[in-house]
């Protein structure tokens, strides 16, 4: 079977899922004919993804939430204005997707939470069936309980999630809890997509805390906390575009640019893990029985709570 991937390219989560599923498919005799990655101007496509993906990669401009001025939270107003201005470009991206789906020769399109894929299937109804995969599809499950706070944000996230899966024949919701499938919505609950490397590296208990911050602006908070706790050894991964591979603040605080293999090495040897978001990294830490601290953020925390 020939498969075409369309991936939402923000952060490392969906990209890591795509790499994992690509290997699973090829190991079982299938082929991934291409990977189309939707991205904004705010982030770069990580080098680890470019290096490890076997199928040819192409990118297109996609709507995404912009960070706030401090690069700590979602800038909702900025995001709305920016995406309205960019809407003509998004129409070009929709045509790009339609043409590639039609000409790919694929038997199946797998959509990793890319909103323009849903819009493309809604507008043009491509003949190639679409399957959507992501932990966010748990939001659609009737038994899934969201927190009581931030109701408006929840409604926006659920609406966004529904748009990503327009026209899908099947939705696969990743979860580390067991739920019954919802056949009415064609929603199946499946385990997280863990990379083989995440399960094969031996676990050792080091003397440092590992962290991952989705928005680089939170590095200021990490540094402030570190000044009050200078004896605790910290290693944090971030996605700051202009950063060196390793940024050493002092003897006990180091920031690392996102690198999947390097991250797994540090995860295997940490004594605890702290993060502002990232479902996949939380799953990998849970697999290794690491103590985990999840810092709630507007929008980000919705992606990992109670899954």
Tell what function each PLM region has.
Residues 109-112, 264-304:
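A donor-sugar binding/catalytic signature common to diverse glycosyltransferases
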């Amino acid at each position: 079977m020939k498969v075409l991937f369309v991936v939402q390219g923000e952060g490392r989560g969906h990209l890591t899922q795509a790499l994992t599923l690509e290997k699973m498919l090829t190991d079982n005799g299938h082929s991934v004919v291409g990977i189309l990655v939707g991205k904004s101007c705010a982030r770069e496509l990580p080098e680890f993804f470019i290096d490890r993906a076997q199928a040819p990669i192409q990118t297109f401009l996609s709507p995404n939430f912009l960070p706030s001025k401090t690069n700590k939270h979602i800038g909702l107003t900025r995001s709305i204005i920016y995406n309205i201005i960019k809407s003509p470009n998004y129409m070009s991206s929709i045509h790009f997707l339609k043409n590639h789906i039609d000409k790919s020769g694929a038997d199946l399109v797998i959509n990793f939470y890319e909103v323009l894929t849903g819009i493309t299937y809604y507008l043009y109804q491509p003949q190639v069936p679409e399957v959507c995969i992501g932990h966010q599809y748990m939001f659609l499950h009737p038994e899934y309980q969201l927190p009581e706070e931030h109701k408006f944000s929840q409604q926006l996230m659920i609406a966004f999630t529904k748009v990503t899966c327009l026209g899908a024949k099947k939705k696969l919701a990743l979860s580390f809890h067991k739920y019954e499938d919802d056949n009415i919505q064609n929603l199946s609950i499946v385990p997280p997509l863990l990379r083989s490397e995440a399960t094969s590296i031996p676990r050792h208990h080091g003397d440092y805390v590992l962290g991952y911050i989705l928005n680089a602006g939170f590095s200021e908070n990490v540094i402030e906390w570190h000044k009050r706790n200078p004896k605790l050894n910290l290693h944090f991964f971030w996605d700051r575009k202009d950063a060196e591979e390793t940024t050493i603040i002092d003897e006990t605080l180091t920031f690392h640019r996102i690198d999947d293999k390097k991250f797994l090495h540090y995860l295997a040897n940490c004594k605890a893990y702290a993060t502002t978001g990232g479902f996949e990294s939380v799953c990998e830490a849970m697999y290794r029985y690491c103590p985990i601290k999840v810092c709630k953020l507007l929008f980000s925390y919705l992606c990992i709570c109670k899954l």
